A protein has these predicted regions:
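Helicase motor core with emphasis on the C-terminal RecA-like subdomain
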Residues: 1-181
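Short acidic, hydrophobic short linear motifs in intrinsically disordered regions
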Residues: 176, 183-190
Length: 190
């Protein structure tokens, strides 16, 4: 009813089961990055198929990918800084040419690999919605897939930084408003 009030009366509502019996979910608390890296190196060798390892930052995606490469895994980092290689890396995962992409949210909506066998979160995502969307990529066309959420101590610092950075400070807003009020002919951005 709330959505119909906002979007209008010609709204079709589809309801479905959110439960995915093919997807096994697990949370593992490993406070230090060293513990999580060791866990990844140990477990990645036992996981069948190919998948995505999500990180919160570009730095962590690069660090995790580099570590796994030193352990003999065929993985690649995929971030907002990947640039021209994005399509090539997406195709490599699609064609099972890499064990995993170690990715930030840059590997987001629109990427579809029905036989994705696992999604591992190196850190807790910023929201439940982000987690659900990312982990839901696994096992769409498989009888069995895994979603593993690794949780560590630096997450709150990263999340707090994202929250603090999301909005301008009071002083920044006051400065912009002051500049607009002081300019008799208004301001425009070139």
């Amino acid at each position: 009813e709330d959505l119909a009030a906002v979007l209008g009366p010609k709204l079709d509502v589809s309801r479905g089961d959110l439960n995915r019996t093919s997807l096994s979910l697990q949370t593992i608390r490993l406070p230090s990055q060293a513990e999580r890296l060791a866990w990844l190196a140990e477990q990645l060798a036992t996981l069948q198929g190919h998948g995505i390892i999500y990180t919160l930052t570009v730095r962590d995606a690069n660090q995790v990918a580099q570590w796994l490469k030193t352990q003999g895994f065929n993985v690649e980092a995929y971030t907002g800084e990947t640039g021209d290689r994005r399509e090539q890396l997406e195709q490599a995962l699609l064609n099972n040419q890499v064990k995993a992409l170690v990715a930030t949210t840059a590997l987001g909506m629109g990427y579809d690999k029905p036989d994705l066998a696992f999604v591992i979160h190196y850190q807790m995502p910023g929201s439940v919605v982000a987690y659900y969307q990312q982990v839901g990529r696994a096992g769409r066309a498989l009888d069995s897939a895994y979603g593993v959420l690794l949780s560590g101590q630096e997450e709150s610092d990263i999340t707090d930084w994202f929250i603090r950075s999301a909005f301008p400070t009071r002083q920044e807003v006051a400065d912009v408003l002051g500049a607009l009020e002081d300019e008799p002919n208004g301001l425009s951005v070139p």
